[in-house]
């Protein structure tokens, strides 16, 4: 969708937002991750998400993230991949990957680019959600 919008001369700005007010994006489905049984399946699963993040990062159009509610795991990566990201005061961000035994390797480059190494490490190791002010204070 991002690549199609990027190639459409009628579209000048892409806004990434949720259709609800409580969750921006909860990231990858835990059930889908548990169903992965081979290296090839794992690579395809995670590369699909990496391709979306890279499409946002490389998009020639202005991309805007509008975070209302929770952004968890991959949702944080999507928000970070946009050119400009706005979040409401009640928005919460959390990297949940370590709690399921993996690192945030797919989203790390985009998030680190936005908030830096120290803030990325803090967000990765923290078990509780952070307020949207965490991004503001670290970007």
Model-derived segments and spans:
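Alpha-helix N-cap/helix-start motif
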Residues: 23-26, 42, 75, 104
């Amino acid at each position: 969708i991002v690549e199609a919008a990027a190639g459409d001369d009628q579209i000048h700005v892409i806004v990434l937002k949720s259709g609800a007010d409580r969750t921006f994006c909860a990231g990858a489905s835990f059930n889908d991750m548990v169903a992965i049984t081979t290296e090839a399946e794992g690579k395809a699963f995670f590369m699909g998400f990496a391709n979306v993040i890279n499409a946002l990062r490389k998009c020639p159009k202005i991309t805007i993230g509008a975070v209302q509610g929770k952004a968890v795991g991959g949702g944080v990566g999507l928000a970070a991949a946009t050119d400009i990201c706005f979040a409401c005061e009640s928005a919460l961000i959390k990297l949940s990957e370590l709690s399921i035994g993996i690192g945030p390797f797919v989203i790390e480059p985009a998030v680190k680019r936005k908030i830096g190494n120290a803030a990325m490490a803090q967000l990765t190791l923290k078990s509780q959600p952070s307020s949207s002010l965490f991004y503001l204070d670290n970007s």
